[in-house]
């Protein structure tokens, strides 16, 4: 487990405004993995801000920010999946020690990244993302099964309505036509 050294909206003496993310103490070179699938954007702020930073634009429109990296392991525009290596922890930018700055934006506004703390804590555990992936597959199967049940019900209703239609209809002209067609085909050969 990574020690949390600064929390969301925490006001430290060296900050001019509340913290917009969560800082996790990490050694330089610790692998950093994306916690969700998305599109990569890179920034290098030099000795300011979050230094080398990876932005992962998630499929739900939110953006995860991984800052103070020592090195990138991805390229601009690349697509990553949950669990993919995106870089290595470092001490770049305005930093008081080696750590990962993690934050989340919705549009242009930072939101509380606390719901994703567990994902960061387990980002280097391959079985964690395999479990998350299998949960999604089960959910998709449940969704598919639910809709197949609905389609089956609608087909049953259609069948009942068709039988009801035939029972109420005078279909003797149809039978007479079929008899004539069969006689023509089989007896006029």
Describe the predicted segments one by one.
Residues 29-30, 74-76, 90-93:
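Gly/Ser-rich catalytic serine loop of serine hydrolases
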Residues 3, 25-27, 75, 103-189:
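Acidic, glycine-rich catalytic/binding loops that coordinate metals and/or anionic ligands
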Residues 24, 53-56, 81-95, 102:
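Short hydrophobic beta/alpha edge segments that flank linear recognition/processing sites
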Residues 5, 25, 57, 67-70, ...:
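Residue-level detector of conserved, well-ordered beta-strand and adjacent loop positions
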Residues 17-20, 34-76, 98-99, 103-106:
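Zn2+-dependent peptidoglycan hydrolase active-site motif and core
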Residues 7, 37, 43-44, 72, ...:
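Residue-level recognition of beta-strand microenvironments
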Residues 1-51, 82, 142, 175, ...:
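Surface-exposed, glycine-biased beta-strand/turn segments
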